[in-house]
Design a protein with these regions (language model features):
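Substrate-binding/catalytic subdomain of NAD(P)-dependent oxidoreductase enzymes
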Residues: 169-267, 272-274
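A short hydrophobic/small-residue beta-strand
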Residues: 90-91, 366
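Rossmann-like NAD(P)H-binding beta-loop-alpha module
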Residues: 110-192
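Catalytic, metal-anchored helix/loop core of enzyme active sites in primary metabolism
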Residues: 141-145, 153-156, 178-185, 244, ...
Length: 418
């Protein structure tokens, strides 16, 4: 893949630099991928190419394995397990694997006294995991959040800048290499960011990786109209991953948020990522940088390599598996936010009062209303900004609007984030 071949070239070009900085000699002894003869950006030594990655362990002496396949299960999991059991250090950018099997793999690494490093799994070139594990090690972190997916951040930024639809900007992102050309679903639906927030939670709060159901929404339903209305309100739409401890319970979520244009997070645009931690005694810490692509990812992979070569064997999640606690999940239905609701309705008398009455019935208090008629098509757009309300209230309320003939489309919901 793109990351693997870029890493291969970086290892060659920076071999002497790495050896000087660590005092250790390094050699690439084996490579494995699906297709030996595939055209690649850089030439590879086919003499050390293996079609079956597991065969490498029987024929070569390996100290460190880079796993850049990217699957949560299958050969990715199998080869990492095999390496750790055979006392081989592992470095991976695979967030899906770590988010799903990180605890199991961490136990294997600790049992066999080897390293499992995954700095590149979250926010590409930003050293956020090492910052949490080492730089903020004595702090009690209560909250971690940020922009964790460069694809979606580019799309939302470019929709605003170019005044183009989601569909057009997605195609542009695919041409530029910011979005997968085949199936970008895992970026767009929030899953990629969600895997990253799970890893950040485990590291920040010294807990086992959560398996509980959480709010996970992507940007597929964001329209150019929402971008324009947000702009009028002095707001921007960002896909945020958020994790915090509320009443000694873990709350994790990924969803689009309306943030102030004057806020720090509201000015992180394009393919950039940003991660913010809040804790004691340090207060707020911010890291920003490119979150994806072979360059930033390889940078983090090489930083993990240097850490291993310098002889440090550390628990993968900062503290040993046995000392990491399980924590109860916060009830998502009690999560509260102000809301942006956009309705497309028939332009007729009584529809607005119908909507506000329904909202009031479910304890959703209206803060602001914007109504834009479309006389030509006999319809109107109604945007409502609410005061804070719970997920339970909004879920129960919105289900009723599905059945009303005056509501032409199911309302678009975006949460406000302060």
């Amino acid at each position: 893949g793109q990351v693997g071949i870029f890493l291969y070239n970086e290892l060659h070009s920076k071999k002497k630099e790495i050896e000087i900085k660590t005092g250790k000699k390094i050699n690439i002894v084996a490579i494995s991928a699906k297709n030996k003869n595939k055209k690649r950006r850089f030439n590879i030594d086919k003499k050390i190419f293996y079609s079956n990655p597991l065969k490498i362990f029987k024929e070569k002496k390996i100290d460190i394995l880079f796993e850049c396949i990217g699957l949560s299960d299958g050969i990715s999991k199998k080869i990492v397990e095999y390496a750790l059991k055979n006392k081989v250090n592992v470095i991976t950018p695979n967030k899906a694997l770590i988010a799903k099997h990180g605890d199991h793999l961490a136990k294997l690494a600790e049992m066999n006294k080897v390293n499992l490093e995954f700095e590149a799994s979250v926010a590409g070139g930003i050293p956020i995991l090492r910052t949490i594990k080492e730089g903020l090690a004595t702090n009690k972190i209560k909250k971690v959040y940020g922009i964790l997916n460069g694809t979606t951040n580019y799309i939302l930024s470019e929709m605003e800048n170019s005044n183009e639809s989601f569909e057009k900007v997605l195609k542009k992102a695919q041409v530029l290499g910011y979005a997968e050309p085949g199936n970008p679903k895992l970026d767009l639906n929030g899953f990629d960011a969600f895997a990253k927030i799970r890893i950040l939670s485990a590291l920040s709060f010294n807990i086992k990786i959560s398996k509980s159901k959480c709010i996970m929404e992507g940007i597929e339903n964001i329209k150019l109209e929402d971008i324009k209305i947000a702009n009028q309100l002095g707001l921007r739409i960002k896909l945020l991953g958020i994790s915090e401890i509320i009443n000694n319970q873990l709350f994790e979520t990924v969803h689009p948020c309306l943030v102030s244009k004057n806020s720090y997070i509201g000015n992180v645009n394009g393919v950039m990522n940003a991660v913010i931690t809040e804790g004691k005694p340090v207060g707020q810490s911010i890291l920003q940088g490119e979150g994806a692509g072979p360059g930033p990812t390889s940078s983090s992979l090489l930083s993990d390599l240097l850490s291993i070569l310098r002889g440090n064997i550390k628990p993968p999640f900062g503290i040993s598996y046995n000392k990491r606690k399980s924590i109860k999940p916060f009830n998502n239905q009690n999560y509260s936010n102000s809301l942006y609701l956009r309705f497309e309705v028939k332009d007729k008398q009584g529809v607005l009062s119908l909507i506000t009455n329904r909202l009031s019935k479910f304890k959703i208090s209206v803060k602001r209303i914007i109504q834009t008629p479309d006389k030509k098509n006999k319809k109107a757009t109604i945007v409502i900004i609410s005061h804070k309300t719970t997920e339970k209230n909004i879920k129960n309320c919105l289900s009723i609007f599905k059945k009303n003939k005056n509501i032409l489309k199911f309302p678009t919901l975006i949460r406000l984030y302060n």
